[in-house]
Amino acid sequence: MNKRGLLKRLENESVICAEGFLFEAERRGYLASGEFVPELALENPDALKNIHKDFQHAGSDVVEAFTYNGHREKMKVIGKEDLLEPLNRAALKIAKEVAKDVVSGQEPNLVAGNISNTNIWDPSDNNKQKEVRHMFNEMIGWAVDEGVDFIVGETFYYAEEAYTALDEI
């Protein structure tokens, strides 16, 4: 069966995008509370696949790549900036793989990339705004390279940061 895009699906039906991977991974013991960086894609890809599949079996029409907080600023804070691109690409590839794995005759799930708040947004600092824009561009670029169907932006505390994310998407 061919896969319709998000907008085409929304013309005639609801699209469910189940979310909450971070808290589910924490609940299952794969993440420590506090850092909340999606290293699971590198450290235990099978566990991440299983979480995606559980969301899929619960009715999600979208497999959202687990890249929440997987941006340059957060990775720098925990001293793992060198894992930035490998982590993002691994999470995107896992999501894409799971999205294709559907019951015969069913439409494949959509794949969503993900960007989130950066914790460095400063409405009065143009340099910080440029830095945030660069981080969004990086993550969106990797998501596009890996073939996502759309990008989700989430958990922004400043409207201006959310608008910047939307502008980059």
Residue ranges and their predicted role:
Residues M1-I169:
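Domain-level signal for soluble alpha/beta catalytic cores
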